[in-house]
Amino acid sequence: ADDAARREQRLAIIKMAQSDRFRGVTRHLLKSFLSPDAMADEALVGRVIAMADAVGRENFVLQQHAILGRQDQSDTLRSLDVPVLVVGGSLDTLTPPERSEEIAALTPASQLLILEGVGHLSTLEAPQAVTDALNGFIAHIRHASG
């Protein structure tokens, strides 16, 4: 769940989106989603903007309201009885590494991977590293289950 400051930021973003400045919201948020190196990659920036455009203003606002209403899931994480891979970026400002560490610590059978120099959109910034981590995680589960 968001803290009070993050909640206020989210409400301001919703207001901006509702004022027909959806692309402006995307450009405004880009630095929250991407690392500085990724921000210099025009093709990647273009892909993220295209993804936001495809979501559309109405769906973006609905997503933000859903996030505002989410409850703390710490108890759910503690109760998980399955292997969990938590992947984060060292430069992720939306889910900072400390939060990824907290999530992993709450989950009994978790592995944590923090990708150095990567922001929030790790699958776009470091697709091979994420794929390798997932493949390794699945292989570990298969090996452990016999």
Please place each PLM-identified region on the residue numbering.
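Short beta-strand/loop motif that positions the catalytic acidic residue
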Residues: 80, 86-88, 92
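Short alpha-helix in the alpha/beta-hydrolase fold that links the catalytic acid
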Residues: 82, 96-105
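Conserved alpha/beta-hydrolase catalytic His-Asp/Glu region
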Residues: 2-6, 20-79
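Catalytic active-site module of serine/aspartate enzymes centered on a nucleophile-bearing elbow/loop
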Residues: 108-146
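Hydrophobic "lid"/C-terminal helical patch
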Residues: 29, 64, 103, 130, ...
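Generic recognition of short, well-ordered alpha-helical segments
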Residues: 4-8, 75, 98, 102, ...
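Structural signature of beta-strand start/N-cap positions in the alpha/beta core
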Residues: 76, 83-85, 108-111
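Glycosyltransferase donor-binding loop in the core domain
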Residues: 17, 52, 92-95, 119-125
